[in-house]
Amino acid sequence: MQPMTRNSRNSPGSRFPGAFAPEPDMDEPKSKSQKKRDMTALQALGAELEALAKDRLARVPMPEALADAIHEARRTTSHEGKRRQMQFVGKVMRGLEDDEVEAIRAALEGFKGTSKAETARMHLIERWRELLLADDAALTRFLAEHPGTDVQTVRNIIRSARREKELGKPPRYFRELFQAIKAALDEKDSAAGEQPPTPEPEA
């Protein structure tokens, strides 16, 4: 039988494979295509930051260097100047730690959730306005769900909104009705701490 040497123990055919073999490197370098995808994603993230409203941008956790780059991009008005500055924003973002990038992503996702809720609420108000203008019975239901509403005020606004529409006047009371409905929903939410149900027309 051939004696086992150090080299033979390391060979693929050894009875004890890997006895002296080095640990495989699990942290393999990223491919060029993966790097390109990562760069594109960070560039898009930077564009989202640049487009944020000022108050929301102030609430996003980010390093000072990135905040400065974003603010400079927002101040830049020329197309070419903004393009170059946004490239710089992307460069700064590529230097961030993974946890910093994730914190930014989490903040942006939170804003998207808030925006969806705000949009849904606006649609709810518009739906109530549509029902109230179309059917007097809808007011009874609205008052039942929002008992704190000033009945006479809302009724007068509805009548005025209908009249101005018939006469082709500017939609002053149409807008006032929106605000009255919004105020009633806000009051209910403050009292109950829950989102009001979406109204559906009675069968």
From Swiss-Prot:
Q: Which GO terms describe its molecular function?
A: ribosome binding; rRNA binding
**Domain of life where this protein originates:** Bacteria
Q: Region entry Disordered: which residue ranges?
A: 1-39
Which keywords fit this entry according to its UniProt record? Cytoplasm, Ribosome biogenesis, RNA-binding, rRNA-binding
Q: Where does it live in the cell?
A: Cytoplasm
Q: What protein name does the entry list?
A: Dual-action ribosomal maturation protein DarP
Which intervals carry biased composition (Polar residues)? 1-13
Please indicate if the UniProt record lists Cytoplasm as a keyword.
yes
Q: What does this protein do?
A: Member of a network of 50S ribosomal subunit biogenesis factors which assembles along the 30S-50S interface, preventing incorrect 23S rRNA structures from forming. Promotes peptidyl transferase center (PTC) maturation.
User: Which family does the entry's similarity section mention?
Assistant: Belongs to the DarP family.
Alphabetical GO CC annotations of the entry are:
cytosol
From which lineage does this chain's organism come? Answer: Bacteria, Pseudomonadati, Pseudomonadota, Betaproteobacteria, Burkholderiales
Q: Which Pfam families does the entry link to?
A: DarP
Major location category of this protein: cytoplasm
Basic and acidic residues compositional bias: what residue ranges?
Answer: 27-39
> PANTHER family attached here?
UPF0307 PROTEIN YJGA
HAMAP family in the record = DarP (MF_00765)
